[in-house]
Design a protein with these regions (language model features):
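Extracellular carbohydrate recognition
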Residues: 607-609, 674-693
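Residue-level detector of functionally pivotal "anchor" positions at catalytic/ligand-binding pockets or at interdomain
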Residues: 428-440, 532-542, 573, 691-714, ...
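Extracellular glycan-recognition surfaces and repeat-rich motifs
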Residues: 534-578, 623-652
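Extracellular beta-strand-rich recognition modules
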Residues: 539, 587-601, 610, 665-674
Length: 790
């Protein structure tokens, strides 16, 4: 190996002396207007060589002096931020000791602590090719029962005669088992070593934790993970030779084009819609995105084609840098691919830690053709489809060669993403607790929803395990199977609470989930007591709210309307739009209080957002609330604050514990903020309520109160509407008509404002079946009447 790389180094030094290749790179801010991205792409400027700032309207790019001349000749306003990138990248590591940085990181708290054998490399903190391969050899020496020795993918070698290596991690790595396969690659582009370094970190981590982490053990035992850390071997060695301290800016491979130029962009050379247009790739040899003379003309793409066609990869992560993005097909067209919903749902979960913006490559950055993701997913005749992603690792300051102190944090922030890729290749599913925060009766049920996410079918067993002595009994486990990808099954397990449970008591149990390989356990905390509805609005009007939101009649959760930020179309750019509850809600006697509502949204992820806020001082200050569906904001939003963005097309029930505001008067506000970039349909909410447990009221099993009159529904059966007549001889507020299913699950509460009258009930959103209706006031309730929904 040493002799081979000595020869290769000599060849690269000779190539480096070709005048046309002495390229100077700079970091430039390019001001953008409508249509400018297309103009840049047509000029051969790489549109994946930097970060877009939609809010301020510029593209921060790392480009050659030749490309900078093109940009200026097109009339763009520019600002040079760094004149000599290679020197700048190397200089900012001066005085930094990689070993000291590693030791400091090992002492820091992290969900993914630094593996003992992981090392930073000698090339600006990144491993050289020899160092990378030495790590693969070291892993095989340490864990021969879990990882293969490095192997050549193919007899085909690179332009300079180098093999492309892979390793496989599994419980029987040298045996071809019938297990889901996942692919990880790094360095399609020679100046993007963070992908390689992350894969080394990830491999060391899962190997070192195999015997101590049961979930990781089961993942490795039931998955075949394939790693190709360096695809563009020649290009990377060229950068190591020209800039041994890091900062080399060569992107392409080292193909001699015969006209004084070198290199083909490997990630424009795959065969699916190769050369579709001259914006997504370039026909000109000197351009950074030169696609070559034909699809798969390059040995690197030929090798990867062979690798994919001789395996059955379910998911692939092709690591790149930089822009804090997670991209997926299509790249060549803005039309969504057939599995767009699956890609989006996976992405939402994979970016939960790093908060990368996700979306189709064509619409999230700019159309590209001949890319790895489009071919891996789109080619389905010579192989099965692969759900292929491109993580673009690093922010605008990290660039292509992050400072050595940033390498480990970048490796760590992508760990969840890489782990989920393996899990999603298998029978992975998610279990969601849907039991109301307030349990109203001692004989009740734990409600849950199971969603199959993984590419492999599985059988799932759900059970509840009581904590403490509050439970008299629990029901049998529930078994669910034969779900399709993204299909959700709703079910429940009955339980009974003991006589020792009193009003406002906390109830705790474990919701256990066995997917056939390992068991996950989540502790669930609820409260026992009679729910008192102190606010309910299903938006027949907007009388309870002020601001610029309005009613929307299409697809409400319950007719006739839902509340929307922009009921007449997409929200506008640079919007700050709120709707605020006019009257305060009193939580004076509450021990527990819950805000709940149904919501759906379509909001540009990573930039625009909605927050739900609460105020306990009549609106002087507002605090954002954390719910089941919020996540921390990115650097382009409100960093770390809970918010909603992305796409949730179906109504979901949000439930937020606001018990910390018990004893106070509160107001609620919804706020949408947008930047100057992409706009979307916005945020919708419906059936908003505030429910509490009243500490002044003892909890009893509700008794029938003979003086409450409730009529039979009319019509019955009902389709969209039915009417109930009622008469309360003793009306004292906090009274409503409850709608429950036959299991006793509370579906809806309709507040009653008068002692008697007729009330029209919208039934259009109820599923067909039988329901029980009754009047509830505190611990008392009327007889139940049956309603049949057609």
């Amino acid at each position: 190996m040493k002799r081979i790389f000595t020869l290769l180094t000599l060849l690269l030094i000779i190539a480096a002396n070709v005048p046309a290749q002495n390229t100077h790179y700079m970091r430039v801010k390019i001001q953008l207007k409508d249509g400018d991205i297309t103009r840049l792409a047509k000029a051969g400027i790489p549109m994946d060589a930097g970060i877009y700032n939609n809010k301020e309207g510029y593209y921060q790019a790392e480009i050659s002096d030749q490309d900078y001349t093109k940009v200026r000749s097109l009339g763009f306003n520019t600002e040079v931020l760094v004149d000599d990138l290679s020197s700048w990248y190397a200089s900012r590591n001066q005085g930094l000791d990689p070993e000291q940085i590693k030791q400091t990181a090992m002492r820091a708290t992290s969900d993914y602590p630094v593996p003992i054998d992981f090392e930073l490399g000698s090339c600006g903190g990144f491993c050289t090719i020899e160092e990378c391969y030495a790590h693969l050899d070291h892993m095989a020496d340490l864990y021969p029962e879990l990882i293969t020795v490095k192997q050549e993918i193919s007899t085909t070698t690179t332009i300079l005669g180098e093999p492309i290596y892979y390793v496989k991690i599994s419980d029987n790595p040298n045996v071809a088992e019938d297990e889901p396969q996942v692919l990880y690659t790094g360095m399609h582009h020679a100046r993007e070593p963070i992908g390689m370094q992350h894969l080394l970190y990830y491999m060391y981590y899962i190997l070192e934790h195999y015997n101590t982490d049961p979930e990781l053990r089961q993942l490795i035992d039931n998955t075949e993970m394939y790693f190709v850390p360096i695809i563009n071997v020649d290009g990377y060695q060229y950068n190591i030779t020209t800039d041994p301290n890091g900062g080399g800016m060569w992107r392409k491979n080292r193909h001699n084009n015969g006209d004084g130029s070198f290199g083909i962009d490997i990630n424009r050379n795959y065969g699916f819609f190769w050369g579709y247009d001259d914006e997504g790739s370039s026909p000109f040899t000197y351009d950074e995105t030169y696609r070559g003379t034909a699809p798969f003309s390059e040995p690197e793409t030929q090798v990867m084609k062979e690798f994919c066609e001789t395996h059955d990869f379910k998911i692939a992560l092709n690591y790149h840098s930089h822009a804090n993005l997670l991209l997926y097909p299509w790249g060549y067209t803005p039309e969504p691919c057939p599995d767009d919903n699956v890609f989006a749902e996976y992405s939402r979960r994979m970016t939960a830690d790093n908060q990368y913006t996700y979306g189709a490559g064509s619409t999230t950055i700019y159309p590209t053709n001949g890319g790895s993701d489009d071919w891996m997913y789109g080619e389905q005749s010579t192989k099965n489809k692969i759900l292929s992603y491109t993580p673009e690792v690093g922010n605008n300051n990290d660039g292509f060669w992050p400072q050595v102190s940033r390498i480990i944090p970048l490796c760590q922030e992508n760990m969840l993403q890489s782990l989920l890729a393996a899990k999603l290749s298998g029978s992975y599913a998610e279990l969601e607790d849907n039991t109301p925060l307030i349990i109203p009766e001692k004989q009740y049920k734990a409600y849950f929803a199971l969603t199959r996410l993984g590419q492999t079918n599985g059988t799932y067993t759900i059970s509840i395990e009581p904590l403490g002595d509050d439970f008299v009994s629990v029901g049998d486990p529930v078994v669910i199977d034969n779900l399709s990808v993204l299909q959700t099954a709703n079910d429940s397990i009955p339980f009974e609470l003991g006589d020792n449970v009193a009003n406002g008591d906390t109830i705790r149990f474990v919701l256990a989930f066995d997917n056939g390989y390992y068991v996950t356990r989540d502790t669930v905390e609820k409260y026992y007591g009679t729910p008192v509805v102190v606010l309910y609005d299903d938006f027949p009007d907007t009388d309870k709210w002020n601001g610029n939101w309005g009613l929307y009649s299409m697809f409400p959760f319950s007719a006739p309307y839902s509340m929307a930020d922009s009921p007449f179309g997409n929200y506008a750019n640079n919007t700050n739009n709120s709707t605020t509850l006019i009257e305060s809600v009193s939580l004076a006697n509450a021990s527990v209080a819950v805000l709940n509502f149904y919501a759906r949204w379509r909001i540009e992820p990573g930039y625009d957002y909605v927050q739900v806020k609460i105020s306990a001082n009549n609106g002087s200050t507002w605090t954002p609330l954390t719910g089941k569906y919020t996540h921390p904001g990115t650097d382009n939003q409100l960093p770390g604050q809970p918010l909603y963005d992305g796409i949730v097309n179906s109504w979901v029930r949000e439930e937020i514990n606001i018990s910390e505001y018990a004893g106070q008067d509160i107001k609620i506000r919804f706020t949408l903020r947008s930047d100057g970039g992409t706009i979307a349909d916005g945020y919708f909410f419906d059936n908003l309520g505030v429910t509490m447990i009243d500490v002044t009221t003892g909890v009893q099993t509700p008794e029938t109160y003979s003086d409450f009159f409730i009529s039979e529904p009319r019509p019955n059966p009902a389709e969209d509407m039915t009417v109930i007549s009622y008469n309360l001889t003793d009306y004292s507020g906090n009274t409503g008509i409850t709608i429950s299913d036959l299991t006793g699950k509370l579906i809806r509460v309709i507040p009653l404002k008068d002692a008697k009258g007729d009330i029209e009930i919208n039934t259009s959103q109820l599923k067909p079946g039988m329901y029980l209706l009754s009047i509830r006031q505190g611990e008392y309730k009327s007889r139940s009447v049956k309603l049949i929904k057609r």
